[in-house]
Amino acid sequence: MNMKNIFLGFLSQIRSILMIFSNIFSFRETRLYPDEPLNLSLRYRGRIILTRNSNGSERCVACNLCSAVCPVNCISLKKSEEKNGRWYAKSFQINLSRCIFCGLCEEACPTMAIQLTPDIELSEFKRKELLYKKKNLLFSGPGKFSKYDFYSISGVNTTYDLKKNLSKKISNCVDVTDLLP
């Protein structure tokens, strides 16, 4: 019985050595990251950017859907209004030290202003530098969706004269007090 245990121990040692030698010459799965670039898919959720339309205007309409859907509340924004009535984000900031890169903000954005790109180099030495403001997030191009324009698809006209058209609609209204018994 003792000899049997010694023989099985010897066989397991030989098997371990053979396994090591067979893996020495096989293809290595580990990539040396800084020297060899990683091949990330286009759907990889990395750096968050704010995109612009093809005409250069910001896509964000400050609807607050991104901050409402964020599970860790890392997005905060303040809205303001242009002269033509269009809303825009006066200030927009994302705390990347809290962000879990879930992509819910990208899915909730109706204008496709927020997009997650396959960029993974987000490390900083100080935690305060992970608070990205609007100037850090703005991207010069349209991002992944170059042909998407929210205002042409939704049919919203920002040059609508409310006072002029409201007076026309009021004059066509029926006085409901005449219908009462």
Curated annotation (Swiss-Prot):
Residues 51-80, 90-119 form the 4Fe-4S ferredoxin-type domain. It holds the Pfam family Fer4_7. InterPro entries: 4Fe4S_Fe-S-bd (IPR017896), 4Fe4S_Fe_S_CS (IPR017900), NADH_quinone_OxRdtase_chainI (IPR010226). It is a peripheral membrane protein. [4Fe-4S] cluster 2 binds at residues 70, 99, 102, 105. One of its GO terms (molecular function) is NADH:ubiquinone reductase (non-electrogenic) activity. Its EC number is 7.1.1.-. GO terms for biological process: aerobic respiration. Its cofactor is [4Fe-4S] cluster. [4Fe-4S] cluster 1 binds at residues 60, 63, 66, 109. Its main location: membrane. It catalyses: a quinone + NADH + 5 H(+)(in) = a quinol + NAD(+) + 4 H(+)(out). Belongs to the complex I 23 kDa subunit family. NDH-1 is composed of 13 different subunits. Subunits NuoA, H, J, K, L, M, N constitute the membrane sector of the complex. This is NADH-quinone oxidoreductase subunit I. It comes from Buchnera aphidicola subsp. Cinara cedri (strain Cc). The lineage of its organism: Bacteria, Pseudomonadati, Pseudomonadota, Gammaproteobacteria, Enterobacterales. The gene is nuoI.
